[in-house]
């Protein structure tokens, strides 16, 4: 069994297609209490993976994840921690995150797609060049390139094959997801179109 958590809805990016939902309608700064995770793990000690989504998980700071790792180590629980992050905070300040990223329990994944909808905090586009820099930072400090998720929307549907070719060039796996009607994304990507893309990839 896996546990999927969302510690925060905060994010350093402003992606136009974001389907991340709110933790609460009352407080956008709300954070998931670690003790709730600890109670779950005590009840289900054989949990395989703790999958961390966002917002962006790195908005929590390293201490949050080190406390979780210390709890797992103390109780000899087998769970690994899978972080899916845009990697920008790590690329800017890698030393800050090395204790988390280099921990053997932790695996890193990221996200990227073409089309201009992936925007940094200053609303400038997160480009392929930016993506390579973030991926290179993980390769340099952790010894591997992270796989990534790409989201299909109307604006970038013509770049799906290009995205798969990028993953091949990087030597990683790319998971091509369709946009869902959630969060800032007000309409799902049409089912018939996404199946056509999957056939084209195949």
PLM region spans:
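Conserved, mostly hydrophobic/aromatic
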Residues: 11, 15, 52, 83
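Active-site neighborhood of divalent metal-dependent phosphoester/pyrophosphate hydrolases
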Residues: 55-57
């Amino acid at each position: 069994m896996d546990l999927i958590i969302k510690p925060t809805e905060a994010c350093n990016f402003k992606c136009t297609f974001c389907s991340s939902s709110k933790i609460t309608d009352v407080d956008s700064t709300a954070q998931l209490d670690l003790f709730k995770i600890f109670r779950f793990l005590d009840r289900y000690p054989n949990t395989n993976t703790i999958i961390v989504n966002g917002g962006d998980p790195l908005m929590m700071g390293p201490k949050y994840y080190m406390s979780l790792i210390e709890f797992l180590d103390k109780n000899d629980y087998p769970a690994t921690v899978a972080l899916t992050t845009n990697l920008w905070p790590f690329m800017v300040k890698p030393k800050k995150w090395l204790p988390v990223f280099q921990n053997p329990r932790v695996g890193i994944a990221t996200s990227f797609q073409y089309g201009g909808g992936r925007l940094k905090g200053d609303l400038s586009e997160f480009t392929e060049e930016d993506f390579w820099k973030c991926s290179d930072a993980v390769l340099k400090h952790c010894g591997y390139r992270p796989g990534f998720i790409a989201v299909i929307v109307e604006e970038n549907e013509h770049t799906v094959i290009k995205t798969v070719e990028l993953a091949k060039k990087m030597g990683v796996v790319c998971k091509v997801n369709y946009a869902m009607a959630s969060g800032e994304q007000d309409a799902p990507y049409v089912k018939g179109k996404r199946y056509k893309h999957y056939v084209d990839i195949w």
